[in-house]
Amino acid sequence: MFATSILRSAYPAYKSPYGPKYQYQPHIDGITPKQLVRILPTAAAWTGVALFAVVYYASGIPRLRRDVLQRIPYLGERYFVNEIPASDNPF
């Protein structure tokens, strides 16, 4: 007989004026820009704390101290230089 899509296309779907007004909301994997703006400061703070902790715990490694920490302007030459006194040097 007749296809159901032909019969239904004659009558538009009823849309109540009191119902919700749906709009497209942009997102990336379900994270909207509003959520991203709310989460970013917290994520940045935790990232900074984690970076500080890694550098603090790894500051005893001579290679990291020499290649990374001593190259920090103003701080590197004052705080991260490890000078061993001649009396403690076994050679």
Curated annotation (Swiss-Prot):
One of its GO terms (cellular component) is mitochondrial inner membrane. InterPro entries: Cytochrome_b-c1_su10_fun. Keywords: Electron transport, Membrane, Mitochondrion, Mitochondrion inner membrane, Respiratory chain, Transmembrane, Transmembrane helix, Transport. The chain crosses the membrane at residues 35-58. It is found in: Mitochondrion inner membrane. Residues 59-91 are mitochondrial intermembrane. Residues 1-34 are mitochondrial matrix. It holds the Pfam family QCR10. It comes from the Eukaryota. One of its GO terms (biological process) is mitochondrial electron transport, ubiquinol to cytochrome c. The keyword Cytoplasm does not apply. Its main location: mitochondrion. Gene3D superfamilies: 1.20.5.220. It is a single-pass membrane protein. Belongs to the UQCR11/QCR10 family. Component of the ubiquinol-cytochrome c oxidoreductase (cytochrome b-c1 complex, complex III, CIII), a multisubunit enzyme composed of 10 subunits. The complex is composed of 3 respiratory subunits cytochrome b (cob), cytochrome c1 (cyt-1) and Rieske protein (fes-1), 2 core protein subunits pep and ucr-1, and 5 low-molecular weight protein subunits qcr6, qcr7, qcr8, qcr9 and probably NCU16844/qcr10. Component of the ubiquinol-cytochrome c oxidoreductase, a multisubunit transmembrane complex that is part of the mitochondrial electron transport chain which drives oxidative phosphorylation. PANTHER family: CYTOCHROME B-C1 COMPLEX SUBUNIT 10, CYTOCHROME B-C1 COMPLEX SUBUNIT 10, MITOCHONDRIAL. This is Cytochrome b-c1 complex subunit 10, mitochondrial. It comes from Neurospora crassa (strain ATCC 24698 / 74-OR23-1A / CBS 708.71 / DSM 1257 / FGSC 987).
